[in-house]
Each structure stands twice: as structure tokens, then as C-alpha cells.
């Protein structure tokens, strides 16, 4: 108890007097009727006074039940009252461990809280709790049996006992008046310190809030009536508590009804299994009553209670001061020491994920020292998945750090070259750091949100599927009972037992499927966040570069050079990450292949020594039986000796099991301590080395050198760490195997000594001949030697199989093959994207930048994560196996329903007819059990590999399709804008034609005036056309000059082979010259391709500039035409409504905003022309407007008639053309289509990859369809990818011809 608590002792004592006063006043009948539910304490009995008012409304009480995980409570239990001043509370909890592990020990856990909490200690009970008129401070008491469930193999109970020390409780404190009662609810998770405690991760609290109104809560609410709280990590000895306020929604509960509000905790411990704890919490509605007061009795009770409380107060105060001061000081010192001990770091722990790596490595010792050999390989597979997930996280962190370093290095190089000032560099670096920090926070928040949502969704799906499974089981049991009504009792019992076994296996498979599906969902979420982070890093870089260009801090030429360097370095970064991933995959495959071999080796050794032990025990029994059969022992003597021998054998085996368990426990702790010490020391050494190398990285100016140093360092550290892991695994196996073999050999020797000494003496005492006994002992010795040799041979065979399996695994995951395959795919995708980009007609600088960013995003997600493919393979295998099993079950059910249809042969027909329904059902259930226990076949494994390959191909095709769609959408937007402008221009010409015709017909304009107007307008159009041609010529000349300068620069900077003299020294050998030329050819081709790409990008940008110039000119032209149309409309005095109808007729596809904008422009032209012609034009009179009003209205009809006539002419021409085409005799279209060229894309082979094949590009061609003049563009869809990277041996070719062909291919 802290000092504050000791100073508060008088307050506790004086509170007793205040309680007495409150008791007396509370009994005066102040409880009024209420129409709302009341929150009442546990154990408060309704009053039995006959003077009771009528019912005044329902109330709430907390039903009795089990507290958290503590002792059970009954209806006679006193309620737990809460004192507001108390800052600490004691929870006495008995926690049930998972899977049948019982913990009878009661733990008193001290948890300091910032708010009041429930107390189940002795001070929580009070005599006054029995008075029903105590309304103010009431407690939500929870009914919470804690149940644990592990995902995985959870249908079988684990033998033995364990203590995990995790306490999960839900409690509440009620406050407020009877009309507006509120409750403060707490959820508490305490990871207490025990011998087997472990750090918890991925904690998720799901709290039911159905029927409550919640406020002051930080949880995420779901649509299913839950709210979720999450915490990333909870260390041993720490507690995690959340609280919120709640009120009961009015009208939800009637009198006597209960509201169940359970809470569920899900977390991961060091075993990597997800554990669930569940506490029950219920609210019961109860009617409120009003007590009629008896004033005299209450007054007497008040004075008596006041005097008694005063005496007790002074007495208690004297006793506490006299006797409990020393105890309080000792308790305070103990609690301070306990709190300080909590703050001490655990041994062998470190930051940055090292502690998690150490925990994962500890699990290998747990697996090797496990007492269940059958679950070792399954646990090893789960450990491998967890390690792969951890490796993915490490690689992603490495990728992010490399990207940040590359950006900083590029800015530094730009500053050193003089293209960026140091002040701008510092400013941009600060902005990048801020953006990166915001991105990390966003990623973390999104990760937490996804994990909470996925966990809740998976839990709901699990609940639904398990309920459906239970319903199917009940239906199956009912059907079986119907079939077995006429069968015998024994047959019915056997079928019932078999059916329960089948249902258990089905539940186990269902839980495994759900766990695998949840694991896949989590892995996909991690992958999505990783890809999102990579794309956001690129987006931040490109956004900041565009911002710097816009602000003038970075010149466009420098930005272009910076982006080119960034793109080139990103290709190197992706190549480096592919190498890191392939190396990590190989090292982990080697590590777990070796671990699998170690587990099998340990199992083989245990099988051998167990076989020898069983042989020795059997020989002891055979020795007695042989003497009995020889007549040297009667039956009573044999039974007595057998009983004694079996007792000795059981005693020896029992002692062996106990010794093995105790010694393994000691060795387990010793191995973990040694392993953690060495691994942590190695991690610290590597971290110091990384820090020293990081200082050297800051002085590096070349990005290639930085990546090379990073690759060397990571490769060296990975190899060193894997070597240490392998050595520690082998050492742990040697120690455990030595311990196991020594104990088993000791037990075997004891059995042989028992046979040779004690049992021999007993037999000799009973008159057995020594020669006969000696002969049997010699035979047993030879039999034991032969058995030992046989078991050793079987062990060697299994070891050889394990070695072959490890070698095959390493061959399949060879880093060279994986890296080559990934490089080939990247080259292919690069060609695809370049081909798509080259098909674009025009792109602006900003659009080109956006396309480049999208290409980087596509290349950033071409890698394969380490964990997701393996997890996906497990899910697919489980799905295929389930589908196959369901199909077999259907066949068996059909056979039971119609047994005569199942059998084909006559013998089987007669046999099946003789069987009863019960026997058929029993055989069907046995077959189903056999199918459930059967392992996956090799065909299903191959099918899974094929499905994984198909999914990978689909992802790549989806990336290509998405990129192509973005390009097509961009070009379509440009074409759409041009089409809109052209439509508007055509509409204006139509309106001009109509207005001129009407003005000429109405003699408002003479022919000479019309000619003058048109000539003036024509001169303006010619001047506009001349300006456009001049601008086009200037742009093309500038582009040609730039291309020529670039070509000259490329030739000047080309490789030395272009600058060598034509004559070659006669003494130099031709082979040397050819070798030098061949070594420089690749550089020449790369430079040439880069020059071509730059030239193509420049031409695309130039085309965009020209299109923009033409669009601007065309817009000016439209403006001129609009000016003329508005002038003619003013002369004809066409109203605005009529002009709007005319525009809607000639522009039927235009939207309403476009028409209004065009009409507003025409109105403005009216004003302009009116201002120009104010001096010379005469104002039209009212009679003139009335005169021409009739043909104003006829304009609409005439324009519609002209458009309809033109449309009819086009329709007639199209119909005649169609009839002429149909009269011709043509070959079928399929026979006339001939595709030229052959193209296919790389085939991802399932075999080990060898020599790489060249990748041709799929082309497109145009053919004339049925000689109609229409062009049909045919894009050849490649065949299903045959991604075989094996190439047959090629013939040798002439060097010069091959070089010409390579240059021609580069030009193409």
C-alpha cells in the first residue's frame, strides 16, 4: 500500500460513520418510482416488508455467477462495493489454461489503476449491502468463465499442466440517480509474471455493446454491435486497461429479462498460436419498489448506529495506528520494489525486432523438447510460416531504408553538381523526412484498422461456419438414429461412436481451414500495405519534384536528369531486392530443411531406442513363458512371475518418463539461455558493424557503389547468422539426443539386468535347469543384437531420405535460378511497357511523369513475397482436399441410399444385399473416417503448383492491362476534347450558313455586303493559319536541332570501339579484337537504346506541344466563327431562346452546361459588335422586328429539315453500300485471316531454370475487311504462357552477322 493509501486510513474508518448516517437517511423512503431500468448491485434481495408500493418500473441487477476466472458466487454472496478514493484493487483469479490445462492456484494480482476498479477482497463485503435501499454506487459484476481456444490442432487436449498468467476481466461501476443511471465499464488484461509467461502481441479486445449507448470510448465500433480495442504488444508484468461510459437504452429490457454482453480477448504468444479468452457479462432488469418509511424505527436506528459507529471508529483507529503501521511500511516497500522490478528489461531482449527473432528461435527448442512427437513437424511448419512473415517485414524495412537513402543521395549529387542550392536541398530533405514520417504513421494506423476488421470478420465467419457444422452433425445423428432403430444395440453404439469420431475429424478440418483462411487474409493485408507503401514512396518523390519545378527551385533540365537517374537506380534497387529475397528464401529453406531433418533424426533415434526398450521388456515376458511351456513352471508360478516382471517394467518405464521430463525441462532452459546469449551477441555485433558502415555510406556519392556495399553487407550478415543458427540447432539436437539415448539405454540396461540377474535367480530358485536358462539367455542376446542392427539400418535409411529431401529442397530454391527467372520476367515486362508507351501518340511532360510513376509502381509489385505463396499453397491444398473429400462423401452417401447401384459385379451385389442397413452405414462411416485421415496425394500437390502459377500469370496480365487502360483513357480524353471543339465549329458553320441565307433572302444584306463580310473573315483565318504554320516550323526545327545535338553527343561519348582507327596492328590476334568488340557491344547497344528512348520521348512531347498549338489555334478559329455568327444573329435580331434551340439542334450530344457556355459567348459577341457599330448602324424599329418575327421562328424547322435530309441521304448510301457488299462472294473471315509473325511471352517453368530464351514482342497488324475500305486492327492474343526458360543448344553464328542483327534489333 502506498503512502497515500496509508494516509487515507482515517478516511476509511470515518466512512463507516457516514455509512450509518446514509443508512438511516436512506431508509426514509426516498426511493421514488422510476420508469427507467435501475442498475442494482449483485446479491441485493427484494424487500419482504408487507408495506410495499405497487410496481414502479423495471430495474437492472447483475446476476450472480463466476467472477472473471475466480471462485463461483451464489445468490447469497455479498455485493462488491467500490470506494471512490481507492486507487488500487486486488483481483483474486483462478485462470483456466488452454486445452484442458487446469490451474488451481489462486493468484493475487496487484494492478495500479487510474480509476476505480472492482474488488473481490474481504473489504468489499459489508453488512449494509443487504439493505435494498442503497441506490448510489452499484457494481456491474461479470459472469466470466474464461475459456481458451487455440487455432490449429485444437480438437485434442494437451496432456500436462501449465500456467500462463494471463488474466482478463470485465467490471463496471454504476453511478447516477435512478432516472439516469450510468456505468463506467473497465476491460482489464494483465500479463502476470510466472515461470512460463511470455510476451503477448496482436492483442484484440471485442466487447459487446448491444443495447447500450456508449460515449467516451476510443474503440472502433462494428456493425454487429461490438466495439474493438487493439494493442500491438504487451510485455510480461504489464497490464492493459480500457474504459468507457454507458447507459442502457430505454425500453430494451423488460422485467426479469437479461442482456448478455460478453467480451473476448484474442492474442498471440510465443507459440505463435492465437489464444482466445472470453468473459461473460450480463444485465438483468428488475422492478423498483418504494419502501414506506417508519419514522420512529428509523430514528432509533439512526442513534444506535451512530453511537456504535463512533465507538468502532475510535477503536479501529487506535488498533490501526498501534499495530498496522509497521505492516503498512513493509507492504509499501514491497510494492515499490515490485514496481521497480517490472521496469527492469527482460534478459536477452532488444529493440528493432530482435526480441521477436529470439522468441521465434526459442520455439525450435520447444519443438525439439516436445513430448508429442506426432506434432513436431506441424509445429515446425507453423514456425516456418511465422519466420517467413518476419523475414518479409525485415525485407520491406530494408527496401524502405534503401529508397530513403537513394533519394537523399540523389539530392546530394544534384547539389554537388551545382543544379541545386544547399538551402533548397536542406528544405527538400526536411520535407521528405516529414512526408516519410507521415507515411509511416498512416501505414501503422491502416495496419491496426485492417487487423481489427479482419479479426472481427474472421471470428464472425468462424462462428457461422461452426454453427452450420453443428447443425449438419445434428441432422446426421438424427438420420443415423432413424436407420439404426431396427439394428441391434451393439451395432447402434458402434455406429454412434464412429459418427462422433467422424464429426470430430470434420470439426478439426473445418477449424484448420478457417485458421488457414484467416492466415491468408492477414498475409494479403500485409502485402497490400507493403505495395501501398512502395507506391506512396514513389508518389512522394515525384510530387516533391513537380512542386520544386513549379516553385522554380529546380530547373526542368535538372529535374529531367534527376528523374532519369532515379528511374535507372530504381531498376537496380528492384534487382537488388530480388537478390535479397532469393537469398533469404534460400537461407530459410536451408534452415528449415535442416531443422526438419533434425526433427526426423531425433524421432528416428527415439524410435530405435524405444524399439530396443520394448524388445527388452518383451524378452522378459518371453523368458517366463518359455519356461512355462517347457514344463519347468506351473501356471500359478508363471502368473506370479509375470505380475512381478510387469510391475518392474512399469516401474522402470515410469521412472524413465519422469527422469526424461525433468531432465528435458532443465536442458530446455539451459539451451534457451545459451541460444539467446549467442544470438543476441551476434545481433549486437552486426548492428555495430552496420552503424560503422552507415557512417561510410554518408560519404558515398555513387548510388551504384552504395547498392554494392549494401548487398555485400547484407549477404555477409545473412550467411553468418544462418551459420550460427544451424550450429545452434545442431548443438541443441546433440544435447537432447544424448540425453534421450542415455536415459533410454539406462532403462534398457536395467531391464536386461533384471532379466539376467533377478529373474534368473527367481527361476533358479524354482528348480529351472541352468543349461536351459542359459540357452534362452543366449538366444535373447542374439535377438537383441539383431534387433539393434535392424533398427540402426532403418534409422540410416530414414537419415538418407532426409538428406535427399534437404538437397532437393535446396535445389528447388536455388537463388541463382530464382534470380534469373525474376530478371527475365522484369525484362519482359519492361519490353511490354515500353511497347505500350511507344504506341502513345502524344504525352505532355506531366503526363509522361505520371506514366513513369505508374511504371515504377508496376515494377515495385512484381516480386514474390516469402510467406504469401506458401500460405496460399496451404490454403489451396486444403480447399482441393476438402472438395475431393466432399465428392467422395457424396459417393458413399449414394451407396448407402442405393446399395444395389454401387456394386457392379454379381458377387458384390449378392454380398451387399445380404448386408443390413446398419452394416452399410457402419462401413460408410468407417470409409469416411479413412478419407478424413488420408493425406493429400501428389496429384493435388501438382494441381496446387499449377494454380499458383496461373494466379501469378493473371496478376502480371492484370498489371499490363491496367497500364494499357490508363494510356487508352488518356488518349481518349484528348480525342474527346478535339471532337467537342470540332463539333462546335461545325455547328457554328451551319448556323452561319443558315443566317446568311436568311439575311440574303430577306434582302437585309446585299450580295456585295455578304461577299465583303466573308472576305474580311477569310483574311483573319489566313492570318491565323500562317501563324500556326510558323510556330509548327519553329518547333520542328528546334526539335531536329536538339535531336542532332543529342546524336552527336552520343557518338562523342560512345564506347572506344567507335573511335578506334580502321587499321589493326598485324601482330594483334583477331580473337583479341573480337573479344574486345564483343565486350563493348552490350554497352553500345544500351546507349543506343537509351538514345532511342530519349528521342522517342522527345517526339511524343513535341507531338503534344504541336497538338496543343493546333488546339489553341482551333479554339481561336472557333472564337472567330462565333464572332461572325453572333454578328449575323444580331443583324437578324434572333432572340436568345431561338439561338439556344438552334444550338441544341446542331449539337444534339452536347450537355446543357456546354450549350449555355456557347450561348453566353455569343451574347458577349452581341455586345462587342454593338459597341463597334454604335456610330454607323441605325437602330431597328419595332415594325422591323415584327416583320421578321415569322421567319425567326421558321429557322428551327428549316435547320431540322436540312439535318434530317442529310441523315436520310447518308442512310440510303450506307444501305446501298451494304447491299453491294453482300452480293459479293467472299471466303470466310477465318480463312482470310493470316497472322504474320510469331510472338510469345516467357513461360514461368515449374522446373529448375537453365539457359534463358530471347523474348520476341507480340505485334499487331491491320487487314482490309471484305474490301470495304474499313480497317480492322487485329491484336494477336498470345497462347497460354509456356514459360519454359530452357532453350535448346544454339548453332554458332558469324560474329559480324550477329552484331548487325543485334544492332538492327536495337534500331527496331
Curated annotation (Swiss-Prot):
Q: What is its main location?
A: membrane
Coiled-coil parts of chain: 455-578, 636-800, 1001-1113
The protein's superkingdom reads: Eukaryota
Q: What InterPro entries does the record point to?
A: Limbin, Limbin/EVC
Q: Where expressed (tissue)?
A: Found in the heart, placenta, lung, liver, skeletal muscle, kidney and pancreas.
List all Basic and acidic residues biased stretches.
Answer: 784-801
Ranges per topology, Extracellular: 27-300
Q: A Pfam family this protein belongs to?
A: EVC2_like
Residues with an annotated glycan are 220
Membrane-spanning parts: 301-321
Q: Return one Gene Ontology term, BP aspect.
A: smoothened signaling pathway
Nucleus is among the record's keywords: yes
A single Gene Ontology CC annotation of this entry is: nucleus
Tell me how this protein sits in the membrane: Single-pass type I membrane protein
Q: Tell me the leader sequence span.
A: 1-26
Localization (cell): Cell membrane; Cytoplasm, Cytoskeleton, Cilium basal body; Cell projection, Cilium; Cell projection, Cilium membrane
The ranges of region (Disordered) come to 36-76, 784-816
- Positions in the Cytoplasmic compartment: 322-1308
Q: Which UniProt keywords apply?
A: Cell membrane, Cell projection, Ciliopathy, Cilium, Coiled coil, Cytoplasm, Cytoskeleton, Disease variant, Dwarfism, Ectodermal dysplasia, Glycoprotein, Membrane, Nucleus, Signal, Transmembrane, Transmembrane helix
Function according to Swiss-Prot or TrEMBL: Component of the EvC complex that positively regulates ciliary Hedgehog (Hh) signaling. Plays a critical role in bone formation and skeletal development. May be involved in early embryonic morphogenesis.
Give the multimer and partner information.
Component of the EvC complex composed of EFCAB7, IQCE, EVC2 and EVC; built from two subcomplexes, EVC2:EVC and EFCAB7:IQCE. Interacts with EVC. Interacts (via N-terminal end) with EFCAB7. Interacts (via N-terminal end) with IQCE.
Record disease entry: Ellis-van Creveld syndrome: An autosomal recessive condition characterized by the clinical tetrad of chondrodystrophy, polydactyly, ectodermal dysplasia and cardiac anomalies. Patients manifest short-limb dwarfism, short ribs, postaxial polydactyly, and dysplastic nails and teeth. Congenital heart defects, most commonly an atrioventricular septal defect, are observed in 60% of affected individuals. Acrofacial dysostosis, Weyers type: An autosomal dominant condition characterized by dysplastic nails, postaxial polydactyly, dental anomalies, short limbs, short stature and normal intelligence. The phenotype is milder than Ellis-van Creveld syndrome.
Protein's name in the database: Limbin
Naturally occurring in which organism (per UniProt): Homo sapiens (Human)
The gene behind this protein is: EVC2
Amino acid at each position: 500500500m502506498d503512502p497515500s493509501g496509508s494516509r487515507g486510513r482515517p478516511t476509511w474508518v470515518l466512512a463507516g460513520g457516514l455509512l450509518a448516517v446514509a443508512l438511516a437517511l436512506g431508509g426514509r423512503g426516498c426511493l421514488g418510482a422510476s420508469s427507467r431500468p435501475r442498475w442494482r448491485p449483485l446479491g441485493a434481495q427484494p424487500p419482504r416488508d408487507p408495506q410495499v408500493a405497487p410496481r414502479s418500473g423495471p430495474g437492472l441487477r447483475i446476476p450472480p455467477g463466476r467472477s472473471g476466472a475466480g471462485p463461483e458466487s451464489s445468490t447469497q454472496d455479498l455485493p462488491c462495493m467500490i470506494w471512490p478514493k481507492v486507487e488500487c484493487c486486488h483481483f483474486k483469479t483462478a485462470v483456466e489454461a488452454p486445452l484442458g490445462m487446469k490451474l488451481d492456484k489462486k493468484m493475487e494480482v496487484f494492478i495500479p489503476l487510474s480509476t476505480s476498479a472492482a474488488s473481490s477482497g474481504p473489504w468489499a463485503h459489508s453488512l449494509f449491502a443487504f439493505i435494498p435501499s442503497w441506490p448510489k454506487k452499484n457494481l456491474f459484476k461479470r459472469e466470466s468463465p474464461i475459456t481458451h481456444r487455440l487455432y490449429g490442432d485444437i480438437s485434442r487436449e494437451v496432456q500436462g499442466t501449465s500456467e500462463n498468467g494471463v488474466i482478463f476481466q470485465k467490471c463496471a461501476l454504476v453511478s447516477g440517480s435512478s432516472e439516469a443511471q450510468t456505468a463506467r465499464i473497465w476491460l482489464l488484461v494483465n500479463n502476470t509474471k510466472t515461470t512460463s509467461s511470455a510476451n503477448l502481441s496482436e492483442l484484440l479486445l471485442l466487447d459487446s455493446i448491444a443495447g447500450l449507448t456508449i460515449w467516451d470510448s476510443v474503440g472502433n465500433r462494428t456493425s454487429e454491435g461490438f466495439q474493438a480495442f487493439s494493442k500491438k504488444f504487451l510485455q510480461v508484468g504489464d497490464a492493459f486497461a480500457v474504459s468507457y461510459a454507458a447507459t442502457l437504452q430505454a425500453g430494451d429490457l423488460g422485467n426479469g429479462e437479461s442482456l448478455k454482453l460478453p467480451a473476448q480477448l484474442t492474442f498471440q504468444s510465443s507459440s505463435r498460436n492465437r489464444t482466445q479468452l472470453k468473459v461473460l457479462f450480463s444485465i438483468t432488469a428488475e422492478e423498483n419498489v418504494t419502501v414506506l418509511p417508519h419514522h420512529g424505527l428509523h430514528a432509533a436506528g439512526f442513534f444506535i448506529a451512530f453511537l456504535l459507529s463512533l465507538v468502532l471508529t475510535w477503536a479501529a483507529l487506535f488498533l490501526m495506528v498501534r499495530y498496522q503501521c509497521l505492516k503498512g511500511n513493509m507492504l509499501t516497500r514491497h510494492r515499490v520494489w515490485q514496481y521497480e522490478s517490472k521496469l527492469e528489461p527482460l534478459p536477452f531482449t532488444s529493440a528493432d525486432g530482435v526480441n521477436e527473432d529470439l522468441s521465434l528461435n526459442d520455439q525450435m527448442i520447444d519443438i525439439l523438447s516436445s513430448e508429442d512427437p506426432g506434432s513436431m513437424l506441424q509445429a515446425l511448419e507453423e514456425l516456418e510460416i511465422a519466420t517467413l512473415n518476419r523475414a518479409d517485414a525485415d525485407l520491406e524495412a530494408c527496401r524502405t531504408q534503401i529508397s530513403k537513402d537513394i533519394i537523399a543521395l540523389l539530392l546530394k549529387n544534384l547539389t554537388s553538381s551545382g543544379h541545386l542550392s544547399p538551402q533548397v536541398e536542406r528544405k527538400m530533405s526536411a520535407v521528405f523526412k516529414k512526408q516519410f514520417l507521415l507515411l509511416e504513421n498512416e501505414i501503422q494506423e491502416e495496419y491496426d484498422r485492417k487487423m481489427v476488421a479482419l479479426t472481427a470478420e474472421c471470428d464472425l465467419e468462424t462462428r457461422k461456419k461452426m454453427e452450420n457444422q453443428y447443425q449438419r452433425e445434428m441432422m446426421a445423428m438424427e438420420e443415423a438414429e432413424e436407420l439404426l432403430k431396427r439394428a441391434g444395440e451393439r451395432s447402434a453404439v458402434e455406429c454412434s461412436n464412429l459418427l462422433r469420431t467422424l464429426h470430430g475429424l470434420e470439426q478439426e478440418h473445418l477449424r484448420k481451414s478457417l485458421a488457414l483462411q484467416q492466415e491468408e487474409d492477414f498475409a494479403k493485408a500485409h502485402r497490400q500495405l507493403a505495395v501501398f507503401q512502395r507506391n506512396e514512396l514513389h508518389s512522394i518523390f515525384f510530387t516533391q519534384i513537380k512542386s520544386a519545378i513549379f516553385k522554380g527551385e529546380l530547373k526542368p533540365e535538372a529535374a529531367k536528369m534527376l528523374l532519369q537517374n532515379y528511374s535507372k537506380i530504381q531498376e537496380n534497387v528492384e534487382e537488388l531486392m530480388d537478390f535479397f529475397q532469393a537469398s533469404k528464401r534460400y537461407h530459410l529453406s536451408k534452415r528449415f530443411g535442416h531443422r526438419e531433418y533434425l526433427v526426423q533424426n531425433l524421432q528416428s533415434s527415439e524410435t530405435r531406442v524405444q524399439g530396443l526398450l520394448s524388445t527388452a521388456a518383451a524378452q522378459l515376458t518371453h523368458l517366463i513363458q518359455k519356461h512355462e511351456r517347457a514344463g519347468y513352471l506351473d501356471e500359478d508360478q508363471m502368473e506370479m512371475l509375470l505380475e512381478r516382471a510387469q510391475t518392474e517394467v512399469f516401474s522402470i518405464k515410469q521412472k524413465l518418463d519422469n527422469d526424461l521430463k525433468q531432465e528435458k525441462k532443465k536442458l530446455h532452459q539451459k539451451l534457451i539461455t545459451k541460444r539467446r546469449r549467442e544470438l543476441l551477441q551476434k545481433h549486437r555485433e552486426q548492428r555495430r558493424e552496420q552503424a560503422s558502415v552507415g557512417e561510410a555510406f554518408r560519404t558515398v556519392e555513387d548510388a551504384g557503389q552504395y547498392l554494392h556495399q549494401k548487398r555485400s553487407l547484407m549477404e555477409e550478415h545473412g550467411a553468418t547468422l544462418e551459420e550460427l543458427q544451424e550450429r545452434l540447432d545442431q548443438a541443441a539436437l546433440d544435447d537432447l539426443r544424448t540425453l534421450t539415448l542415455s536415459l533410454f539405454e539406462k532403462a534398457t540396461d536395467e531391464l536386461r539386468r533384471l532379466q539376467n540377474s533377478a529373474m534368473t535367480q527367481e527361476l533358479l530358485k524354482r528348480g529351472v535347469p541352468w543349461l536351459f536358462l542359459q540357452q534362452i539367455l543366449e538366444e535373447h542376446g542374439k535377438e537383441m543384437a539383431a534387433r539393434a542392427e535392424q533398427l540402426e539400418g532403418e534409422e540410416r535409411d530414414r537419415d538418407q531420405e532426409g538428406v535427399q529431401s534437404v538437397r532437393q529442397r535446396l535445389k528447388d530454391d536455388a537463388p541463382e535460378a530464382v534470380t534469373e527467372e525474376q530478371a527475365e520476367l522484369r525484362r519482359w515486362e519492361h519490353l511490354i511497357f515500353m511497347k505500350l508507351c511507344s504506341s502513345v501518340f502524344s504525352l505532355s511532360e506531366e503526363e509522361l511523369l505520371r506514366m513513369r510513376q505508374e511504371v515504377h509502381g508496376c515494377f515495385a509489385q512484381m516480386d514474390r513475397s516469402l510467406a504469401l505463396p506458401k500460405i496460399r499453397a496451404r490454403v489451396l491444398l486444403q480447399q482441393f482436399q476438402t472438395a475431393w473429400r466432399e465428392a467422395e462423401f457424396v459417393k458413399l452417401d449414394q451407396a448407402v441410399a442405393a446399395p444395389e447401384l454401387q456394386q457392379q459385379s454379381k458377387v458384390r451385389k449378392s454380398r451387399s444385399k445380404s448386408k443390413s442397413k446398419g452394416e452399410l452405414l457402419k462401413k460408410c462411416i468407417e470409409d469416411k473416417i479413412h478419407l478424413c485421415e488420408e493425406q493429400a496425394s501428389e496429384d493435388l500437390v501438382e494441381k496446387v503448383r499449377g494454380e499458383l502459377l496461373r494466379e501469378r500469370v493473371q496478376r502480371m496480365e492484370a498489371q499490363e492491362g491496367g497500364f494499357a487502360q490508363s494510356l487508352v483513357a488518356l488518349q481518349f480524353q484528348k480525342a474527346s476534347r478535339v471532337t467537342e471543339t470540332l463539333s462546335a465549329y461545325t455547328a457554328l458553320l451551319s448556323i452561319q450558313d443558315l443566317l446568311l441565307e436568311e439575311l440574303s433572302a430577306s434582302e437585309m444584306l446585299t450580295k456585295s455586303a455578304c461577299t465583303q463580310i466573308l472576305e474580311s473573315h477569310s483574311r483573319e483565318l489566313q492570318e491565323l493559319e500562317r501563324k500556326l504554320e510558323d510556330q509548327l516550323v519553329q518547333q520542328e526545327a528546334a526539335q531536329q536541332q536538339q535531336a542532332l545535338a543529342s546524336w552527336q553527343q552520343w557518338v562523342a561519348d560512345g564506347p572506344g570501339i567507335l573511335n578506334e582507327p580502321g587499321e589493326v596492328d598485324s601482330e594483334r590476334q583477331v580473337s583479341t579484337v573480337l573479344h574486345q568488340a564483343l565486350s563493348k557491344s552490350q554497352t553500345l547497344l544500351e546507349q543506343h537504346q537509351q538514345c532511342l528512348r530519349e528521342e522517342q520521348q522527345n517526339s511524343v512531347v513535341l507531338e503534344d506541344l504541336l497538338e496543343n498549338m493546333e488546339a489553341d489555334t482551333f479554339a481561336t478559329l472557333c472564337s472567330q466563327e462565333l464572332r461572325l455568327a453572333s454578328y449575323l444573329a444580331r443583324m437578324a435580331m434572333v432572340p436568345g431562346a431561338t439561338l439556344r434551340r438552334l444550338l441544341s439542334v446542331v449539337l444534339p450530344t452536347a450537355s446543357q452546361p456546354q450549350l449555355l457556355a456557347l450561348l453566353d459567348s455569343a451574347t458577349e459577341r452581341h455586345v462587342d459588335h454593338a459597341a463597334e457599330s454604335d456610330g454607323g448602324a441605325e437602330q431597328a424599329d419595332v415594325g422591323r422586328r415584327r416583320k421578321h418575327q415569322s421567319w425567326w421562328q421558321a429557322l428551327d424547322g428549316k435547320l431540322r429539315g436540312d439535318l434530317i435530309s442529310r441523315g436520310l441521304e447518308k442512310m440510303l448510301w450506307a444501305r446501298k453500300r451494304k447491299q453491294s457488299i453482300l452480293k459479293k462472294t467472299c471466303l470466310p473471315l477465318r480463312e482470310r485471316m493470316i497472322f504474320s509473325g510469331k510472338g510469345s511471352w516467357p513461360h514461368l517453368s515449374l522446373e529448375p531454370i537453365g539457359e534463358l530464351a530471347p523474348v520476341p514482342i507480340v505485334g499487331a497488324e491491320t487487314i482490309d475487311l471484305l474490301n470495304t475500305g474499313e480497317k480492322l486492327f487485329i491484336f494477336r492474343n498470345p497462347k497460354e504462357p509456356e514459360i519454359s526458360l530452357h532453350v535448346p543448344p544454339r548453332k554458332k553464328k558469324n560474329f559480324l552477322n550477329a552484331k548487325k542483327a543485334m544492332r538492327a534489333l536495337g534500331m527496331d
